[in-house]
Amino acid sequence: MVYSYTEKKRIRKDFGKRPQVLDVPYLLSIQLDSFQKFIEQDPEGQYGLEAAFRSVFPIQSYSGNSELQYVSYRLGEPVFDVKECQIRGVTYSAPLRVKLRLVIYEREAPEGTVKDIKEQEVYMGEIPLMTDNGTFVINGTERVIVSQLHRSPGVFFDSDKGKTHSSGKVLYNARIIPYRGSWLDFEFDPKDNLFVRIDRRRKLPATIILRALDYTTEQILDLFFEKVVFEIRDNKLQMELIPERLRGETASFDIEANGKIYVEKGRRITARHIRQLEKDEIKHIEVPVEYIAGKVAAKDYVDASTGELICPANMELSLDLLAKLSQSGHKRIETLFTNDLDHGPYISETVRVDPTTDRLSALVEIYRMMRPGEPPTREAAESLFENLFFSEDRYDLSAVGRMKFNRSLLRDEIEGSGILSKADIIDVMKKLIDIRNGKGEVDDIDHLGNRRIRSVGEMAENQFRVGLVRVERAVKERLSLGDLDTLMPQDMINAKPISAAVKEFFGSSQLSQFMDQNNPLSEITHKRRISALGPGGLTRERAGFEVRDVHPTHYGRVCPIETPEGPNIGLINSLSVYAQTNEYGFLETPYRKVTDGVVTDEIHYLSAIEEGNYVIAQANTNLTEEGRFADDLVTCRSKGESSLFSADQVDYMDVSTQQVVSVGASLIPFLEHDDANRALMGANMQRQAVPTLRADKPLVGTGMERAVAVDSGVTAVAKRGGIVQYVDASRIVIKVNEDEMYPGEAGIDIYNLTKYTRSNQNTCINQMPCVSLNEPVERGDVLADGPSTDLGELALGQNMRVAFMPWNGYNFEDSILVSERVVQEDRFTTIHIQELACVSRDTKLGPEEITADIPNVGEAALSKLDESGIVYIGAEVTGGDILVGKVTPKGETQLTPEEKLLRAIFGEKASDVKDSSLRVPNGVSGTVIDVQVFTRDGVEKDKRALEIEEMQLKQAKKDLSEELQILEAGLFSRIRAVLIAGGVEAEKLDKLPRDRWLELGLTDEEKQNQLEQLAEQYDELKHEFEKKLEAKRRKITQGDDLAPGVLKIVKVYLAVKRQIQPGDKMAGRHGNKGVISKINPIEDMPYDENGTPVDIVLNPLGVPSRMNIGQILETHLGMAAKGIGDKINAMLKRQEEVAKLREFIQKAYDLGQDVRQKVDLNTFSDDEVLRLAENLRKGMPLATPVFDGAKEAEIKELLQLGDLPTSGQITLFDGRTGEQFERPVTVGYMYMLKLNHLVDDKMHARSTGSYSLVTQQPLGGKAQFGGQRFGEMEVWALEAYGAAYTLQEMLTVKSDDVNGRTKMYKNIVDGNHQMEPGMPESFNVLLKEIRSLGINIELEDE
């Protein structure tokens, strides 16, 4: 492998054995590609805004003499960039401007004569833009639009599996689901009649739809039945014979022809009989007259002479009717062919229950069902039916729907119209009847070929279309009303409904979610989430077991592991690592093509529909050198089943072993040794890990860490290669390589880093450079680490030395015993940033004022405020401290004579205001790290606001001028090169001031041209700088757009440092979670022979029953990694020769059986080897990919190389007594996470507080400062113990006895510890409720 200079700093040893055929794709592409499709101009008009505009425009007036046409659209530039939007609390969006054309036609002239055309660009609201990381900033907070898994449009055939009817009869149904429009359902009832429902309304006989489509009874029967023809010859009845139709029936008479008896009466007709009849080519047989009785006529029979209808179609024939038919000259009678086996009489029966006879009555029946209570007219009924399924405005199957529809009906072409046709409806009914007759199968609705993904772009487009349709009505009215000569497109379009629809979707849709920003993994997982809930999806209550279950088609598309526990299990899923969506929105996964038994590197993406036809081998199948299968029989998947196939039957092979799982699960080493339930918890808990103060890469990883860290966007990644020219904590400057520069640019890339900002979950986002001055970097290298990343690798937790042993009951039931050393070294110390806001409003009594002059507050409380009444940066504050002083005017109250006197003596004291300052919430303490003041336009800024403004201006100017200097330097170095090449002497040139260089003239014309070009660039650079500075200044000084009635907002940011403490929740990556029970002194912890104490003691009993053995293997491998690190560390301390160091490290990298990773340290310089060794001191990072990890033998080899016992167990000594424990203990290094369930956030106590209004009981929950509920079962417990007084106290004074609790408080204050219980308020509520039922109930005083 070739490593870049940055990648050589630390190389993770990989145990993977399967070759990496396909790199992990960009993990956020599902979001970015979808949104890109939405906003980019699509000339085809298939997707995005373009499609929405084309589907609604042109809008014609009712009279048809004017129309509004759509020409094109463009998106403007956003006013603020992403960071500014987050600070100001506004939406990151761009204005949408649409060019419309108003065409007015001549009224009297022939059609299509244009009278006037006006074109104008119209503003149509703001469209939120996606940031580079796939999120949206809505009102200053980052949100993610989760993709939705919904039922694909098309036709589905299903059955109720015998659950509807008591007899257990299976009822089949078909459902046509459009992308938008009415659903059409066909269903059988227990009597085998076929019914239809529109939009799940009342059911009607299915033939009504056919009649409404203008079919007669005869035509209907003709469509669905084959015919049996009888002929009357010489008063004998003959039947045209098709032998195959007799199969399985019992002969009710002798079947004979030409004097030969083929089947005797009462015998069953078998395949042998049929073969004989066919062989002898028997076309007619004579049947007894009774045989025709009970058959059904296939068409109307009319008496030719009188015109009288003798026998209508679908009537049962009897012997009398036969005689009548014979008399009136009908010698050939057609009947319907039905039997009990595979030609049921369903449609014929349905026609009998159908009350309608012609098209009009059918339309009226449909109208009555859709609009009950309205009087039907012919026009209304016709237009309603037309609009239901045959109007492009109201009904659209979409391209996907049409494709699925045609595939389901086995048609050849997969494209077609978006509306239904007669043939469509009839084909669906025919297929449903075939399924009822036993031909064909019902669909599996949980198959991923029947469920598709709706991503951001598509959902935004739908919302936008909704907005446009609302505008369309208004435009139509305007066109009809107005004076068209003066109208402009702008006067007709109101942007409000459009922007409201879009805003509503991004702001409050169920699928627009507050981004989970605990750490980079939780961000990535949130963006790759797939939800079956949401508008147009399932609901938690309705979803059954089948929908939630893992389906064979999930393989490689949706992760079988990562899904929430609880009510949403299986409804919210995660995209697998390599999965992507195809043009129709179905999930597809990559496979390697197998040609002639050789596995090629050609990659094909297959959707679940296509995959069903192939035989697919697993990724871990053994291959020979040439790429053939090593074994004759290979385990493969085909048609949803897994079995053995011979090697020449295989069509495809999996790309990678981690193809099955999602990003979260692919980060769990030794996943293959964990029980699925625990793996699920492990994957979910990694997302809750809080970024620690110093990130620490996992010693045992899976090799996915780098991909996650880079793709999540929390790190700064080099856009182009070059040399690090400047680096400090807040910016990195790269001088770009010559070959990567655009012609005529300065070739400088500047990366500004994010410092100490707050995430959505109040964790700290901070970037730190990880490159040094003059280092070479390549494109894609990580320049700066973000939260939870270490040298460009995801690092969610810390490597801890763990021992599996009980320790005095402190690790009973999943508790965790932690050494004090962990606290001292700040291993799990985290920084949390809280934002507290103070809003000053305009009230009826006057404006609230932010000031340091607060009534009745001592000097001490104001000590941390400046003269504007706002806390200064760097102040350390605790609960109850004032952060922003604010007073609110209160109404004049009647003054007591004493107050009047005092006010007369001491002058006007501010009694007409009350203190409403922003204080630090109880239980919170920290350091103020930032203050921001937002002032409404037109309100005078206070001193602090002006100071902040000035500081921001200074900073902006400094940033821009530094940027300018860097760019100038780059430019002048190029100018100097041109001048020297043009013949100017270097010494003379250096004596001249730089700005005079451009005045020099060169004789060489080409060089002079270059010089002039550079001079132009220089001018442009300066001009650009002035422009940027002016724009920045305008943004900083302009007033803020605040909510109505708000004058000022002051936001204070507090940073809180939280050390780990008892009650915090910790976990490993294998679902092994626990709560810290005790922080133990270092000297009491168990230690080994070298005197090294362990950091954490875990309970060994937590492993066997939970079957997550991965944690033990991780512990052993971690120990080996650390052992090798220790040896390297010792060699570095002894200052061994580089050659020896290189040899040892090379040995470690080469270890293992046929691993795919080849690291050749001979290509590294001595410096690079030393730097690599320096980074391996604390342990050699290892990767064991999912399902392709380290084997037991390899772990033992590695342990031997690190001079450690191969059992992975060592002798420990008790820290308190110094005695040896009686048996060796498993000790090693495990990667532990601190989860965002901190005891500080949960700890809560209440004395008195707020009460519920009706019941007068204390509220519940920490947010309401509520009490602990003493519930029904707790009352039973006290009753069982007969603790009457305790119980009385609980049910009265501690709960809802209003007088009692006030008295009790008073008594406590007076030092009299007595209580007088009274009547609980909830009893009064009960009395009132009984009285409201009209029962008078009173308490009698005894």
UniProtKB/Swiss-Prot annotation:
Record carries keyword Flavoprotein: no
One Gene Ontology CC term in the entry: DNA-directed RNA polymerase complex
Pfam families xrefs: RNA_pol_Rpb2_1 (PF04563), RNA_pol_Rpb2_2 (PF04561), RNA_pol_Rpb2_3 (PF04565), RNA_pol_Rpb2_45 (PF10385), RNA_pol_Rpb2_6 (PF00562), RNA_pol_Rpb2_7 (PF04560)
Catalytic activity, reaction form: RNA(n) + a ribonucleoside 5'-triphosphate = RNA(n+1) + diphosphate
Gene Ontology molecular function: DNA binding; DNA-directed RNA polymerase activity; ribonucleoside binding
Keyword field: DNA-directed RNA polymerase, Nucleotidyltransferase, Transcription, Transferase
EC id: 2.7.7.6
EC class (word): transferase
Alphabetical GO biological process terms: DNA-templated transcription
Alphabetized SUPFAM superfamilies for the sequence: beta and beta-prime subunits of DNA dependent RNA-polymerase
Keyword Nucleotide-binding included in the entry's annotation: no
Lineage: superkingdom: Bacteria
CDD domains per UniProt: RNA_pol_B_RPB2
Subunit structure and binding partners: The RNAP catalytic core consists of 2 alpha, 1 beta, 1 beta' and 1 omega subunit. When a sigma factor is associated with the core the holoenzyme is formed, which can initiate transcription.
Sequence similarity: Belongs to the RNA polymerase beta chain family.
Function (record text): DNA-dependent RNA polymerase catalyzes the transcription of DNA into RNA using the four ribonucleoside triphosphates as substrates.
PANTHER family referenced in this protein's UniProt entry, alphabetically: DNA-DIRECTED RNA POLYMERASE I SUBUNIT 2 (PTHR20856)
Protein's UniProt name: DNA-directed RNA polymerase subunit beta
Natural source organism: Cronobacter sakazakii (strain ATCC BAA-894)
